Structure formats: C-alpha cells, structure tokens
Amino acid sequence: MTQVDTAPSNFIRNIIDSDLQSGKHQVIHTRFPPEPNGYLHIGHAKSICLNFGLAEDYPNALCNLRFDDTNPVKEDADYVAAIEKDVRWLGFKWAGDIHYSSDYFEQLYDFAIELIKKDKAYVCALDAQQTREYRGSLMTVGKDSPFRNRPISESLDLFARMRAGEFAEGSMMLRAKIDMASPNMKMRDPVLYRIRFAHHHQTGDKWCIYPMYDFTHCISDALEGITHSLCTLEFEDHRPLYDWVLANISIACKPRQIEFSRLNLQYTLTSKRKLHTLIEEKIISAWDDPRMPTISGMRRRGYPAASIREFCKRIGVTKQENTVELASLEACVRENLEANAPRAMAVIDPVKVIISNYDENKTEKLIAAIHPKDESMGTRTVTFSREIFIDRADFREEANKKYKRLVLGKEVRLRNAYVIKADQVIKNDAGEITEIHCSYDPETLGNNPTDGRKVKGVIHWVSAVENQAAEFRIYEPLFLVENPAAAENIDEVLNPNALVIKHGFVESGLSDALAEKAYQFEREGYFCADNKDSSPERLVFNRTVALRDSWGG
C-alpha cells in the first residue's frame, strides 16, 4: 500500500488522481509561496502541510518553496530566514533551491512587453483616486481609462521609461486591457506594474518598477512547471485573471489554480497587518511571543511540530469555510506530549512544609518513573528532605470531603514518597500561611499505611534543600472572544490574563533543561523551557497546554 492509498482523501487529491490517471500529468508539482512580509502563522501551516504533504505522498512529486517578493516596501530578508526556519521545523523539505519571484523579474518584464505588443496592456497615467472612480463598483460598470487606447508604440516607450526611472511613483502604471464592464472587479483592467523606488532584499536597486501579485504569481507557477497551484478561497475571483495572463503570453505550462478554505481558529487572529499592530503597540513582545499564532510563537510555547501536522491532517481540506475550535488544536498537542513528555515535579505557587519528625540532617534519594506508561524512558532520582515545598492550592485549613489534598489534621500522600499529616500552620502578620508543620509515616514509602487506613489524595512537591528556582509563564488565549477579527477595537477584547508569571521551584534534575525541552509537570500541565530566556542560571518554563481540556465548560 502506498502513501497515496493511506492518505486522507479530499477534493484536491481527487483532482490530482484524475489528472494522473488521464495522463494529463505524469508528475505532480506544487509550491508554497509566502510573501516575506511577516512570520508564518497557524493558517499558513495548513497550506504548508497540504502542498508539501502532496509532494511526499505522490511518486516523484515535488514542492517548491517560493517567496512572492514583489513588494519591497513591506518585505525583508529577516522574514525570509524566519519562514525557511519554520518550514524546516515543521518537518518539510523543498525541491531544489529556494525560489524567488524576483528571480523572474527580467522574464516578467519581457512578458509584459509581449502583452503591450499584442494590445493586451497599456500604460495608464490615472492617479489612485481616478483609478478607483473609473473602475466602478459591483453595482455599476467601470469606464475606460482615457489612456486605454493609446498607441502600442507609445505604451512601449513609456514602459521602458518607467523602468529607466523617469517617472515619479504613482504617476504611471501598466494595466491589462481586459473588460471594464466585467462583473468580476479583478478583470477590470487590473494593474500589472507600478513604480516603486525602494531597495529590494534580493535585487537591490536594480529595479524601480515591480510587478503586481496577480501578474507575477501565475507566471512564476508556469516557469517552475507547477501543475496544481493551491490557494485559499479569497483568491477564487483571481482565477480568471490567472488564466487570462497565461492564455495571452507565450508560455507552454498552464498550471491549474484550485482554491480551498482557509484555516480559521477560535480566539485567534491571523491578519498580518493586525499582528503587526500588536507588536508596534507593544501589546506583544515579538513575532515569536508564545501568545502569538505564529509558527515560531507556537514552537516557543512548546507545541511539537508533529502535533501541528496532525491538527492540519484532522481538519482536512474542503471548500467549506468554518471556524475550528481551539480545543481541537490543543488536543493534538496534549496527545503528543502525553505520550512523549518526561514527567517531573514543579511547585508553581510554593508554601513551605516542615516535616517535624523527619531527621533534619537526613535526605533521601527516591526513585520515580520518567514516564508512568513508558518504562523504556527509565527512572529519575528526586531528593526528599525535612523541608519541602508544596503548592499553596494543595492545602486548606478546612475543607469538604471532595477536597482530596492536604487539610489540617488530615493526611495526604506525597507523589513518589511518604504519607504526611498536617499538624500546625504558621502565619505572618497579614494572616498568610508561611509554613505548614507536618508529620510523616516512615512505613509508607511505596506502601499503604500498615493499619489499613485509607489515604486518597496525592500531591506533588519539591525538596526545599535541593531544587532549582524557576519562572513559570502561564499562557491563556490572547483574546476573550472567539472571533477577535470581528472586533471594532482589538484592545477591548484582549485577555488581561493571557500571560501570568509565577515563581517557584522544580526538581534539581531540571537544571540543564534544554531550550524547547518539553515536560509534564505532574498535576500542573505541560511545559517547555523557553528558547530565548531560559538558561541554567535562570530557568524559564512556558506552559504549553493544561493537563486537561478546559473548553468543555
């Protein structure tokens, strides 16, 4: 059975299968074509997994990584490097070298001249406001530009002079000559080239005219031999222009554009423009902030690459627009970490426990499983001592029977250690508990109490003598509403508790936790060492997801 046989079926795969069976194509060639004007986000992950996944599944198939870099004003080499890094981290390899649309600028220019010579394009001198007015609306047809029927020779001359830098930005543009009465606004003599005196990260200052996306994209696909050009549904009304350009130039390859629904995720914003604003207003620290929906942000937060790929596989590929529950993504992350993350103990909101009947000069090295369901991971050693820390939420002076943790006058088991009983509390002047004095049953290490009494609760702990101080960053969704994109004012729907920072302790064995190393902190959640701020001298752990789904109400 081949990978194609086991891959989930969808309408795009059905089209590809039909094209292969009919002999229309012998080899499938796709591409992932981001614009380098920001970081990739979870929405891009769906396209990455689709395009590169097809190349992995079909025999001899290829997938290019191409940067659609036609707007030097917004693009940057740093974004190029970040995108490359994200695609690699997700586990994909592109065919051959990286491609850039700017690699084809000379050929694109020649194709533009061909259109002019065929009287399919003309140089227009309308300004931006006039162009909008002449275009009309969905309710009214447009009207021809006064420059639409200028002589071919004149347009050729002006276009050459545009390239030579003789005209100011906004004073001239090259437009396709299609149909100003078309019901599709994209076909009303769209702009093919505009003047931009801007430094380009690939071509430097060689060019001062730059092709528009709709002109560049289809030709780049054709030049690279792309068979199936896959894009999201907002490009559906661009397809007639895609086909028109290729039909009117001398190029053999005619890729087929196919649209699929974009990924919309609850409580998540994927507009690059709005994400830029969050950074500019210092609401978010950077593109890789763990609260961001970017691939690098999710990586820093601790999402495994495999869990993102699995999520994209589960949501599938359709033409139906919908919004996916954030819980679905978190479930994929949780399943991966449950199976693979080593266990450790961490106390995030510590209060000291003193075990009065334990020798103050004694410590014990206790053995604990690294993973309770995977013996192959082995064991770890944890230090037990007279003074330990427990989480403040794991103690109450009074509680009902449902509270299965430590209560004054009652017993609880310490994970991987002994049964203890709370005998006394010490408080400061503000009435806050500073110490809990307990006694332990020395016969209960790995055993139930010998007299048959039942101890139901189990809590985690960390030695107060051997530990590592740590900062814990507890993350929640950045927005309070399911659809933040619909909010008139983003500031009003920001979650003030999207990041809560706490300070506590972890087992001493975590002092050398590597960047992005994932752990299940028992009874607390899944965490990873921050890939920017954590070091042996200052441990910083990001909470990736809670232990359980909290979205069910």
Curated annotation (Swiss-Prot):
Protein keywords? Aminoacyl-tRNA synthetase, ATP-binding, Cytoplasm, Ligase, Nucleotide-binding, Protein biosynthesis
Keyword Transferase set for record: no
Query: What is the first-listed, main subcellular location in coarse terms?
Result: cytoplasm
Q: Which PROSITE patterns match?
A: AA_TRNA_LIGASE_I
Record's subcellular location: Cytoplasm
Q: Which GO terms describe its biological process?
A: glutaminyl-tRNA aminoacylation; glutamyl-tRNA aminoacylation
Residues given in the record as ATP binding sites = 35-37, 41-47, 232, 262-263
Q: Which domain of life is it from?
A: Bacteria
- Protein biosynthesis recorded as keyword: yes
Q: Which top EC class is given?
A: ligase
Its EC number(s): 6.1.1.18
Give GO MF terms, alphabetically: ATP binding; glutamine-tRNA ligase activity
As annotated in the record, motif 'KMSKS' region runs over: 269-273
Alphabetical GO CC annotations of the entry are: cytosol
Q: Which reaction does it catalyse?
A: tRNA(Gln) + L-glutamine + ATP = L-glutaminyl-tRNA(Gln) + AMP + diphosphate
Annotated binding of L-glutamine, by residue: 68, 213
Q: Motif ('HIGH' region) spans which residues?
A: 34-44
Complex formation: Monomer.
Q: Which HAMAP family match?
A: Gln_tRNA_synth
What is stated as this protein's family in its record? Belongs to the class-I aminoacyl-tRNA synthetase family.
Q: What is this protein called?
A: Glutamine--tRNA ligase
Q: Which gene encodes it?
A: glnS
